[in-house]
């Protein structure tokens, strides 16, 4: 019980006025004071749900399915001596620690049969990356996903989570999301706008979330949200799907923002009902078809989700192409790219799909659809850094290993638990298998830990220093 959760009276009076008649304020307050259930989402870019559950159940992990996400589970662990975020499985990207309610927007987006999984998608407010990586998994790394984040302080964690989860089809940008309607009109097949909000639904994980709450601040945020939603609408192709979501409860930031867009653009868009999104979704569905998740309904965070469809174009007074600097990458000539890809296939049995671009001494793998937005948008990061070049060749990167190491059929060293512990502590290891030559992918239980290099019978550790852990990551 979080007895110190700050729930000011003026907030509770505000909530009481909008609480549906069939729900109880007493249950709402009690829910807000209860700790959140721990929840995770299995990363199917790395492992199937069934294989993950089978692998972790012997370690005392118990799974309770999240009804609106096939890959989501509430989790209890018999042994919590290793923090969940420091487990080897988490560092290898097999799962993402994600609040259950926050899995809803992406589920709503892909429940639409109109979403092209190999198309051009936008996550307009992406950090820390839970929904970006969820979208990429449902796209199976196909197409291209633009992941935008306005806050510069959150870009690093977004990038780290994208790399950890083996996501290869993302281009990261750093803009106020209002630019997408101006610079890229009718470009995206589907858009998620998980908008910045007052965070009223997050008190179960942040007892001070409402410390600065006021009606005035809600009205200010709602004005920002309306601008972001209108821009997203203009950036969406006719026939496309737009999901708007928040982790807040006030109607000013939710229904009213969507209603403003619906009224402004008339028959150019419609609202989908989400009453059938998952079993018992109707318990949280409004008469209009929005999902308004109160924390006491599903024992989760508070959340709001709306799904809109764009039917035809409208005049776009926002359009104003952005000013871009010189693009720092050049396509890698075929005489360089083809031998490199052949060598990677010969050494590891896997061919990374995409386009190779070079910058200084780096070789990057860009998504196939990158050409659709090249020259229209400035990116902080595109695809994955495949390798670093030297006078006598190249060295594959850790993120290449995380993205493709599980698919490799050769050039692999499988470690036992003792050697895996040593490897994750940044130490060289002496595996039992016969020594080879050159670089190899280092795995444990079939999943990639990183890269290494044979030096005699020793595997020289190439784990990035920031990922080295000085404790046991494998539990009892």
UniProtKB/Swiss-Prot annotation:
Disulfide bonds: none annotated. GO terms for biological process: rRNA base methylation. InterPro entries: Methyltr_RsmF_N, MeTrfase_RsmB-F_NOP2_cat, MeTrfase_RsmB-F_NOP2_dom, Nol1_Nop2_Fmu_2, Nop2p, RCMT, rRNA_ssu_MeTfrase_F, RsmB/NOL1/NOP2-like_CS. Signal peptide: none annotated. Transmembrane segments: none annotated. S-adenosyl-L-methionine binds at residues 125-131, 149, 176, 194. It holds the Pfam family Methyltr_RsmB-F. CDD domains: AdoMet_MTases. Its EC number is 2.1.1.178. Belongs to the class I-like SAM-binding methyltransferase superfamily. RsmB/NOP family. This is Ribosomal RNA small subunit methyltransferase F.
């Amino acid at each position: 019980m979080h007895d110190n959760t700050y729930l000011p009276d003026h907030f509770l009076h505000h909530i009481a006025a909008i609480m549906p008649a069939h729900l109880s304020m007493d249950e709402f307050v009690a829910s807000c004071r209860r700790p959140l259930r721990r929840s995770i989402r299995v990363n199917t870019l790395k492992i199937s749900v069934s294989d993950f559950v089978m692998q972790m159940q012997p370690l005392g992990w118990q799974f309770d399915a999240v009804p609106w996400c096939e890959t989501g589970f509430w989790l209890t662990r018999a042994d919590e001596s290793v923090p969940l975020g420091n487990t080897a499985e988490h560092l290898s990207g097999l799962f993402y620690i994600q609040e259950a309610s926050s899995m809803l927007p992406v589920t709503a987006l892909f429940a639409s049969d109109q979403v092209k999984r190999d198309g051009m998608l936008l996550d307009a407010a992406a950090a820390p990356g839970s929904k970006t990586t969820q979208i990429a998994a449902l796209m199976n790394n196909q197409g291209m996903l633009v992941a935008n984040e306005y806050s510069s302080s959150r870009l690093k964690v977004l990038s780290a989570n994208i790399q950890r989860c083996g996501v290869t089809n993302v281009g990261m940008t750093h803009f106020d999301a209002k630019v997408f309607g101006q610079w890229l009109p009718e470009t995206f097949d589907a858009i998620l706008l998980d908008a910045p909000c007052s965070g009223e639904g997050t008190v179960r994980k942040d007892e001070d979330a409402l410390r600065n709450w006021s009606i005035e601040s809600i009205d200010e945020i709602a004005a920002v949200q309306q601008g972001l939603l209108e821009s997203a609408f203009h950036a969406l192709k006719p026939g496309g799907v737009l999901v708007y979501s928040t982790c807040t409860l006030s109607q000013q930031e939710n229904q009213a923002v969507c209603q403003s867009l619906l009224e402004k653009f008339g028959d150019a868009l419609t609202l989908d009902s989400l009453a059938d999104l998952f079993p018992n979704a109707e318990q949280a569905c409004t008469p209009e078809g929005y999902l308004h998740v109160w924390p006491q309904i599903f024992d989760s965070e508070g959340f709001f989700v709306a799904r809109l469809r764009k039917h035809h174009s409208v005049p776009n007074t926002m359009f104003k192409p952005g000013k871009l600097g010189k693009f720092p990458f050049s396509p890698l000539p075929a005489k360089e790219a083809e031998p490199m890809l052949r060598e990677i296939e010969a050494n590891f049995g896997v061919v990374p799909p995409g386009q190779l671009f070079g910058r200084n001494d780096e070789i990057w793998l860009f998504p196939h659809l990158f050409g659709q937005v090249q020259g229209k948008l400035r990116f902080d990061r595109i695809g994955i850094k495949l390798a670093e070049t030297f006078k006598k060749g190249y060295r594959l990167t850790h993120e290449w290993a995380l993205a493709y190491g599980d698919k490799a059929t050769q050039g692999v060293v499988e470690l036992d638990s003792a050697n895996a512990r040593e490897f994750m502590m940044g130490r060289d290891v002496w595996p039992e298998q016969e020594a080879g030559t050159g670089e190899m992918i280092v795995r444990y239980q079939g999943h990639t830990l990183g890269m290494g290099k044979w030096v005699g019978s020793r595997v020289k550790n190439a784990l990035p220093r920031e990922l080295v852990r000085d404790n046991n990551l494998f539990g009892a």
